[in-house]
Amino acid sequence: MSNYDKEIPPEKAELVDRRAFLEVAAGAVAGAAVSGAIPEIAAAQNSGSDRGSGPLYMQTNEIQNAIIHYRRDGGGALTEVERVLTGGAGSGTFKPISGQASAPNAFEGAGSVILSPNRQLLFTTNGGDNSVSSFRVGKDGRLTHADVKPTGNPVKGKSGTAKSLAYAPSKGILFVVHSFGPDHVRLMSVDAQGTLGMRPERYTVNTQEKTDRVPTMGVLSPNGKFLLVGTTFDQSIAHTGLYPDGSPILWVPQPDGKYRVIASNAPDPDGLVLFPVQDDGTLGGAKFQDAKAASPFYIAFLNGRPDAFVIGYAVGNGCAMATIDSDGKINVGPLVKIDTSPGLPSELCWLSISPDDRTVYATDFGYSYISSYHINGSGLKIAKDPACPKVPGDGTARGLNTTVTSGPSDCWITADGAYLYQIYGNASALVGYATRSDGSLHEINRVKIPYNSPQGLTGF
């Protein structure tokens, strides 16, 4: 009998020790740090005199959704420049992924606000009504609304779930990922002016046996040949229900009477989903690959190594280095776990990689702080855990580990690696940090943002 299929009498299900079980789930691969010398971070990251300025963009995800445009000065401080309506609807404080009336991280996703590589267009999802908006970006970073179009997926219930974007400019195609399927991935056409067009193609990350999977984000490989999609649940927590204490049910009965954790890739080797990108921008058949640990939430390619990427695991509680070859075969290295003493799972869900590919910053939703890794050759090593003090929320939000959280979600690092910005939704705060060569973060700026709803960060 598999460790993941232990028989549990239904009357005992509510007494399950979730920490013990999630330790099993997280152990789909044993974590191991790769030792070796850590090179010093470039001096540009430590000197304030040559740090540049630029725009930073975040979506409010309010019912009347808007993009907030901040101006980042040479010292990293943020000043709000404008709020531009998207023409679409967000989910507000409602969290569709769990059905909670008010909670941070509405969609369990990443990459909801992105820029085109030439920085002339900005795209954002509108999760409330399943639409996408485009903007033209001026030389000063100011936004001009270009278009808004539905993704093609109908809204069921109180909100849609469009949440992650990837853009292939050479093909004029935008890939849109939704939390709920079966049509998880939809395509939209884009022209040079940002005009959007709905397309009929639709793709799923479900399998024949798993018909309620929840993907997290879509990322194009640097060569544009593959769309990689991360996953977090094999069954949505909005559909599994709650324990009497209000925490989500993470173990569900199977037809054979056994119970299984709903975290993806725990242990079935199918948590990473790869779609070949065809010449016309449409996708080939899905290939399900082993992520080697539970809930491979975030995928971040290195800046200088187009065949290498880092995976952040929400239930695996750590990160791993991975490579992809020209045929799309993925090889995942050892999992390097963070300290999980605050509770399991950590919900390590978002990553930012420094431009010199030496440091990874990992956002821990369940712990209300950020951890950091150093990239050492082909592996990872913990740098600072935590890398910054915990940011408290208002006490109303809890992670899957039942601990109170401020709900940190998307983060973004500047092109010079000098500053990192982090959303703490339940604290109504966007926090700016100065990076340090040892992997630690020093808070330099904090601005008030809408409560619980904001998501998505990008800039230049």
Which positions does each model-derived feature cover?
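N-terminal secretory signal peptides
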Residues: M1-A20, G27-S35
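C-terminal segment of N-terminal export signals and the immediately downstream linker at the start
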Residues: L15, G36-S53, Y57
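Beta-rich, blade/repeat-based domains predominating
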Residues: R51, G88-L115, G152-S170, N206-F226, ...
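Short, conserved, GDST-rich strand-edge loop motifs in beta-rich repeat architectures
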Residues: G54, G230-A266
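Short loop/turn segments immediately following the C-termini of beta-strands
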Residues: N61-E62, R72, G127, S179-F180, ...
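Short loop/turn segments immediately following beta-strands, especially the blade-tip
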Residues: R71-A77, R136-R142, L187-L196, F275-T282, ...
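Beta-propeller fold detector
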Residues: T79-G88, T144-G152, G197-N206, G284-A291, ...
